[in-house]
Amino acid sequence: MAKQATADKRQRRERGSINPDDIISGAFELAEQVSIDNLSMPLLGKHLGVGVTSIYWYFRKKDDLLNAMTDRALSKYVFATPYVEANDWRETLRNHARLMRKTFMGNPILCDLILIRAALSPKAARLGAQEMERAIANLVEAGLSPEDAFDTYSAVSVHVRGSVVLHRLYEKNQSVDSGPRAIEDAVAIDPATTPLIAQVTSQGHRIGAPDETNFEFGLDCILDHAGRLIQKGSKAPAPSRQRKAAKSAVRAKAAAPR
């Protein structure tokens, strides 16, 4: 069942003793109890032991508070995620994706703020763009074109986010009686009519589920494709060599007897 939007009331603070950092920290504590959706300014005031006007002095509305929470959450997330390195791009990108997923899966509040709410302040958006730039630059150094490096990192990001958000929505649906919560719950799997699906699902595979098996398979597909692009690029002659070869061919043709 969903947690009821109540909070333990602390001893009331003295007037003027609260600051923005305390409010943000308290909001994270309260969100762990009641969820981001049920977080409210009056409830936060009770949790912190202050009048709600003390909160409104710093954050005029809930969205302002959530933006500040997102900034803090994103900075922690960025520092917790390993970098993509050019000299070992495949394994470092794999580890980057795995830890990204693990971080969000282990922290529903982080998932709700960054992935589901997806409203980044200019500061948070700038920080996120800088981290993506670094990852893409290292993929270019590893041998991908800028376009392929961008598409590869974007595909990994979408793959991670899709897996995490689907898992988070599944968790939320578990608290309400909303019928089938996964695709396989709604699909009638009958060995007589769907023998292949029945065979594979009996071995533990799940249809469209954001589980480890499906995540790793999709990640392997993205990395394998990037590897083929790098291999293809390494075999292509460099532009400078192509230009030299073209000039040599022109000279040879001009010097040939007619």
Model-derived segments and their meaning:
Residues 1-18, 194-204, 234-258:
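N-terminal intrinsically disordered/low-complexity leader segments
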Residues 22, 64, 95, 130, ...:
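Amphipathic alpha-helical interaction segments
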Residues 22, 26-64, 68:
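Helix-turn-helix
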Residues 72-78:
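Short, basic, alpha-helical segments at the C-terminal edge of helix-turn-helix-like DNA-binding modules
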Residues 80-116, 120-130, 146, 153-156:
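Hydrophobic alpha-helical connector segments
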Residues 131-153, 157, 163-181, 204-208, ...:
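Hydrophobic alpha-helical bundle segments that form small-molecule/ligand-binding pockets
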Residues 181-208:
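C-terminal lobe substrate-recognition/regulatory segment of protein kinase catalytic domains
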Residues 212-233:
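A hydrophobic membrane-anchoring alpha-helix module
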